[in-house]
Structures are given as C-alpha cells and as structure tokens.
Amino acid sequence: MEKEKTLQELVSNLVTVTQRDYFLDSIEVLEKSLFTTHQTIFELTSLSLSLPWSDIVLRMFHEQNLLDQDKDACRAILETIKTAVKKMESMEIRVAYNITDADVRDIRNWFLYQLKKDILLNVIVDPSIIGGIVIYRNGMYKDYSVAHYIEQYGSV
C-alpha cells in the first residue's frame, strides 16, 4: 500500500509532457548505471534524478529495503515507475504567451480537480489565439480563445 501511495506522489509531481520525458530519460540513465558502476544505489539515484523525484524514488527503495545494493529489485521498481508514468494521460493546451511554471501547475491542478485524475500538460505557445486557451484532449477540441470569439462574433 505504501508503495502505491509513494508512486502516486511521484506521478502527481509530474506536470508537463516535457517533465515526463526528462524524467523517463533520467530513469533510463539510472537503470543503466546500476550495473555499470560501483556507486551505491543512493548515490546513483541522487546523481541521476533531480528533486523532488530523487527523494521520492529513494523513499520507494527504502520502503522496500532496497538501499543495500539489491540492483535487480531496484530495476523492478524502476520498471514499475516507468510503466506508471507512461500510462499517464496527456492533453495539449494552447496559450497566447509564455506562462509561468506556477501558472502551468495551477492549470494542471484545475484539471486534476475537475477530472479527478493526474494529467500531463503539453503547453504550446500560439500568439495567433490572442488570449484565452485552446484545449485538445482525447480527440476533444475546446476553443476558449479571443481569436475564436472574434471569429464567431466579429468583435470582443
């Protein structure tokens, strides 16, 4: 049960598709390093993953009593993590200008609250929408942009 809770915490800390891709690449580096270096699992994890993910993965290893160099068991946990992360649903949002990381997290949290599930955002900056947001998810398209409003109604 604790493993699932920690895995959920890890997934919840991934907000964007870019973060997911970077995280999966880092997990691959960690996994390969397990068997090609003499560093400890703790050292490898701390070097391969950035915060907060390194802390969460180390906690998963610790919960399974794996910090004593059981590299095959660590690899199994890393596979579990990769599988869970790859299963995460993503959606594309288009905004008119660069938004802050805090704004991205707030938008993601709003979708989390509305949809009751973790969703990764692929944020695209598209100045042609002028303002607002355009959402693509599972074949669904919702256009809440100023450009769409002007197109429909002729003015703002």
Q: Where would I find each of the regions flagged by the language model?
A:
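Elongated, mostly alpha-helical coiled-coil "stalk/stator" tethers of large membrane protein machines
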Residues: 1-130, 134-156
